[in-house]
Amino acid sequence: MIPGELITDDGELELNAGRATVTVTVSNTGDRPVQVGSHYHFYEVNAALSFDREAARGFRLNIAAGTAVRFEPGQERTVELVALAGDRVVYGFNGKVMGKL
């Protein structure tokens, strides 16, 4: 065994099973790439990303932990978001919530 190694049953694992999801189309209107990490509150991402922010309130990217999605300048792509879990309290990021969702 390697330190930190995970040994799972055979087959596929479904990430975030049973959690609410929403799909949004995102456009990078800026002149620089924007990278968003797996656990960043998507509602509060860089202002150069144009999308339905209210639909993203309380959601993050539905991707594996520790990974990210990069939005190139002028690029438009559709992403799936998954609801934040736990107490659903958000502090930090861009300071747009600072409390309970």
Curated annotation (Swiss-Prot):
CDD domains attached to this UniProt entry: Urease_beta
Documented EC number(s): 3.5.1.5
Major place of residence: cytoplasm
Catalysed reactions listed for this entry: urea + 2 H2O + H(+) = hydrogencarbonate + 2 NH4(+)
InterPro entries the UniProt entry points to: Urease_beta-like (IPR002019), Urease_betasu_sf (IPR036461), Urease_subunit (IPR050069)
Assembly, per entry: Heterotrimer of UreA (gamma), UreB (beta) and UreC (alpha) subunits. Three heterotrimers associate to form the active enzyme.
Name of the protein in its database record: Urease subunit beta
Native source organism of the sequence: Paraburkholderia phymatum (strain DSM 17167 / CIP 108236 / LMG 21445 / STM815)
Lineage: Bacteria, Pseudomonadati, Pseudomonadota, Betaproteobacteria, Burkholderiales
Chain's gene name: ureB
